[in-house]
């Protein structure tokens, strides 16, 4: 049996651009680890490589985000026309299983560990079902990834990734996890064994990235007690790692120091906003803005690069606040912003339901618009065009070369811990990527006003496919 596992991708500019980076989706390696030993499995990440459309597999699994749906169903339709069986899974497929079933032979609406082996067994017997929604087997069922399938020549800066936990205990109103997943975590011994015995390391750059990896968890700090136990177990391994976690974890100085001792050199946290009204509107009470400066200084002093994501377009945002964001950031000397987006009301979130009830969703939105860069609603205090104008300006300012120079100058000498300076240097391209939305000057970044990618538009017309309309 020949199986392909494909993580699809379309660039937020809607141009045909690849985006190799340190952190990539590891869903293909996860699914591959659930396939039977007799299967010949290939994995593809479209951020790194094109999908070979002339190849043939018996079974093709697709992993995708909401905004990649139109592109993914084009690929599925092309493969099905040539006799291949296609499968879709993920959050979009779980929320829209009936629509997805029109373009794929089977839909997985549950966790992969309980559903992928069952689906493959049914396919082998010629008894494939249309939908697989078996209950979760719990975090102990997470299998080691097929790290040996990662081709580091396609992405020279990529780090291997691992999951220690899933879900998040918080209830931010715009987050796709809210109301759908409880927080759960794997036994620490299981995680450590996978790192020691299964993980494969990036050999590029004269070994500078050897023994470095990323935790792919949505929130590695969902249980501070668990994180402490994990860090204690990581210390003897002498590895270098990064993770994403919520801001509240970083208020604990002893835990931050323990993370650094365990090899943590990079933390990403969704601060989202420096405006108290916006934080309140997001139901993100774990972000205490009065402590931001102290948390930043504490984390960098420990030898950890702290990176933030900011979003604009929230209901608390005003013209005055958005105008002053660069000033606020200048006051936070060591602040690093590596993601800048527009808040997106994903259809399965409380934010979407709130906007729907208030008739504030913009008309003509399609699944492609839910990419974290396109305004899909009318904010309370701003006209849609004002949001986009501020977004463009901030992309240019925060992603500028002078800002990257300040990033290097202010942070390189803050710590002498191993690989700290290396982490600071590798973060430069991340900051520069904030400028990506400016690469397509024709892009409006308002739902319903931008065409799909040229290739997808042509293929959909030829195949008789229509975009999925959300409003």
Regions found by a protein language model. Give the residues of each.
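Flexible glycine/acidic-rich beta-alpha junction loops that bind and position SAM and/or redox cofactors
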Residues: 10-14, 99, 277, 281-282, ...
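Radical SAM enzyme core and accessory elements
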Residues: 2-8, 17, 37-43, 123, ...
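A structural motif corresponding to the C-terminal end of an alpha-helix
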Residues: 34-40, 237, 295-306, 332, ...
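Radical SAM [4Fe-4S] cluster-binding motif and immediate context
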Residues: 144-307, 312-314, 320-322, 327
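Short, electropositive alpha-helical surface patch
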Residues: 52, 57-66, 228-234, 300, ...
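Structural recognition of alpha->loop->beta junctions
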Residues: 99-118, 258-267, 324-340
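Acidic, low-complexity intrinsically disordered segments
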Residues: 1-210
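Structural detector of well-ordered beta-strand residues that form the stable sheet scaffold
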Residues: 87, 108, 242-244, 307, ...
């Amino acid at each position: 049996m020949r199986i392909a596992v494909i993580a699809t991708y379309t660039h937020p500019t809607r141009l045909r651009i690849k985006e190799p980076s340190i952190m990539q989706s590891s869903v293909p390696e996860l699914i591959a680890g659930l396939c039977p030993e007799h299967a010949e499995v290939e994995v593809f990440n479209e951020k790194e490589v094109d999908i070979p459309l002339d190849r043939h597999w018996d079974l093709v699994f697709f992993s995708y985000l909401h905004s990649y749906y139109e592109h993914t169903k084009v690929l599925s339709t092309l493969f099905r026309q040539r006799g291949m069986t296609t499968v879709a899974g993920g959050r979009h497929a779980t929320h829209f299983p009936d629509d997805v079933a029109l373009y794929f032979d089977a839909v997985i609406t549950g966790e992969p560990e309980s559903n992928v082996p069952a689906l493959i067994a049914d396919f082998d017997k010629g008894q494939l079902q249309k939908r697989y929604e078996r209950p979760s087997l719990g975090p102990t069922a997470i299998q080691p990834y097929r790290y040996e399938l990662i081709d580091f020549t396609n992405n020279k800066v990529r780090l291997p990734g691992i999951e220690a936990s899933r879900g998040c205990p918080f209830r931010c109103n715009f987050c796709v996890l809210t109301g759908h997943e409880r927080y759960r975590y794997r036994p620490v011994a299981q995680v450590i064994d996978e790192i020691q015995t299964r993980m494969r390391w990036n050999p590029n750059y004269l070994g500078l990235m050897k023994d470095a990896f990323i935790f792919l968890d949505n929130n590695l700090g969902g249980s501070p007690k668990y994180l402490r136990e994990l860090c204690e177990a990581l210390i003897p391994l002498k590895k270098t790692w990064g993770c994403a976690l919520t801001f509240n974890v970083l208020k604990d100085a002893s835990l931050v120091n323990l993370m650094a001792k365990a090899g943590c050199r990079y933390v990403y946290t969704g601060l989202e906003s420096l405006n108290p009204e916006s934080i309140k509107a997001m139901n993100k009470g774990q972000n205490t803005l009065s402590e931001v400066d102290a948390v930043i200084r504490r984390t960098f002093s420990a030898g950890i690069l702290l990176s933030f994501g900011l979003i604009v377009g929230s209901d608390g945002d005003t013209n005055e606040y958005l105008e002053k964001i660069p000033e606020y950031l200048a006051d936070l000397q060591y602040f690093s912003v590596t993601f800048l987006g527009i808040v997106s009301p994903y259809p399965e979130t409380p934010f979407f339901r709130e906007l729907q009830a208030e008739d504030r969703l913009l008309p003509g939105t399609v699944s492609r618009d839910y990419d974290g860069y396109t305004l899909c609603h009318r904010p309370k205090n701003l006209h849609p065009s004002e949001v986009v104008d501020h977004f463009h300006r901030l992309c240019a300012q925060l992603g500028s070369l002078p800002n990257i120079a300040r990033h290097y100058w202010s942070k390189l000498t803050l710590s002498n811990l191993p690989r700290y300076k290396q982490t600071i240097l590798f973060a430069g391209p991340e900051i520069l990527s904030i400028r990506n939305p400016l690469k397509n000057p024709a892009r409006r970044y308002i739902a319903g006003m931008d065409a799909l990618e040229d290739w997808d538009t042509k293929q959909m017309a030829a195949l008789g496919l229509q975009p999925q309309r959300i409003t």
